[in-house]
Amino acid sequence: MLLLKVGVVNNFLHSMFKQVDVFLKEKQVTQATGTYAYRAYLETLLNYGPSAKDSQLTAALFYKDTAGKMDVANPTTAGDAGNAGLRARYVFSKTSGIIELAGPIFSDVFMTERLLLSYVDLKVILNRSSNEFCLMASEDDVDYRVKLSDAYL
């Protein structure tokens, strides 16, 4: 079994998407920006406590990176020289298998306490980020890719 030296970035579920467009009755209700991954990361850092980050948010592959080691791109680096968060996420990606992820969609329309009326069509479009944005590799000139097999709301 070939183990690749490529890991996934923190908050991987949300880093795979650069923009989330939400439509209600064919009218876009979200602002079209390419900063969804950054918003999701900041919302995760600021709105969740340590217990949530260590439990339910790991389903989106959120593992806290080691301070001062975020530029270490080799996920196999062990000990104090490596990034513990990258190493924890590498466990899931090292065999290039299927990873099941779960997490909320960080969009204002989903954070409201109001309910959606019956017969109002809801359409969510998840626009992918580049592979280079959501993967970290210590090797140069490699073509690692993320392939989505299924998605459910």
Regions found by a protein language model. Name each.
Residues 1-153:
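Short, low-complexity Pro/Thr/Gly
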